[in-house]
């Protein structure tokens, strides 16, 4: 699908992030080491599943501070934070304090990408 539509974006929302590193590792392993599972299908572009992830997919999360810690494995450009407002489990009205806690020690550029710039790029608007 991503070979045919390289600009297509697919996301996983409200699923947090910690499952992604294992999933990417297993997808790449299966693609390389278990050809019986990929018989008849190979990437036209020679890309691994994890490379398609980096180019075409994203994850939105709310409370996954461990995911923030391993953001380089998941991909800083593939992560979007959301407060889940107005639902009752939302971080609002303490969203700023919550973000300050889970992004403590994270470079400002990474924090900005995850909390604003990545969503702006995905949906085609300019962040504040």
Which residues fall in each region the model found?
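Histidine/acidic residue-rich metal-binding segments in metalloenzymes
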Residues: 2-51, 65-77
């Amino acid at each position: 699908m991503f070979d045919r539509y390289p600009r297509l974006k697919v996301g996983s929302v409200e699923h947090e992030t910690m499952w992604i590193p294992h999933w990417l590792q297993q997808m790449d392993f299966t693609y390389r080491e278990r050809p019986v599972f990929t018989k008849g299908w190979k990437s036209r572009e020679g890309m691994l599943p994890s490379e398609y992830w980096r180019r075409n997919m994203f994850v939105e999360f709310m409370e996954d501070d461990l995911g923030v810690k391993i953001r380089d494995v998941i991909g800083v450009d593939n992560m979007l934070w959301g407060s889940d407002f107005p639902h009752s489990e939302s971080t609002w009205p303490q969203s700023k304090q919550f973000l300050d806690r889970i992004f403590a020690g994270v470079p400002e550029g990474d924090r900005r990408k995850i909390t604003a710039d990545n969503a702006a790029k995905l949906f085609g608007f300019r962040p504040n």
